[in-house]
Amino acid sequence: MSTATTTTAENAGLPAMLDTKDVAEMFKRCNLAVYAEARRIYYREVNLNPCKKYPKQVLQRIEWWFWDWFAYDCAVSGIGLTGNESEDLRIELQYGPGAGISPFLALAEFMYDKDERIGTREIRDFRELDDTNFASMFWIRDASAVKGRLTVEDIIHGGVYEVADVHAASQYDGAHGGMIVNRIAHVRGVGRSWSIP
């Protein structure tokens, strides 16, 4: 069992990152039933018209959102992945507030136990990301490419956040308005963007 982990060795100031596609792919290999059930739930909610042809970019974006939703918003039973095939097949999706742990955290904890490249710093980043991340719709109050930051207002839950995201800040530089759907988390004392805006 191995997965790709993007750590920021070239910049120790940035947190470690685990790609949500890798999380979904690992669960697809270790417990296809959990992966398939989550996929059915997600696509039922998305409710795409099967008779309509969608552009490839739309379908890719929906798939990216599935990876994020599965990794961060689903919950699985027990302690998560163990590396023991028969144990991992017993994992089930959990429902309700506070039930289980996220697939993201399950894989992060597994990697911390099994992969010497994942140390104390990385697992702390993963746990903090898992604790603080949330997805919402945000109104862009300000974007500065120079600062590499966005100031966004959560229009669903309320609150204003300053988010470090060089790519999005460059893309929306100078914007004082406009809406994005994004996932943000507070890791290492800084709000950061954790999905594709």
Which sequence ranges carry the predicted segments?
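Mixed-charge, low-complexity intrinsically disordered regions
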Residues: 1-137, 142-147, 167-197
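OB-fold (S1/OB) nucleic-acid-binding surfaces
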Residues: 141-162
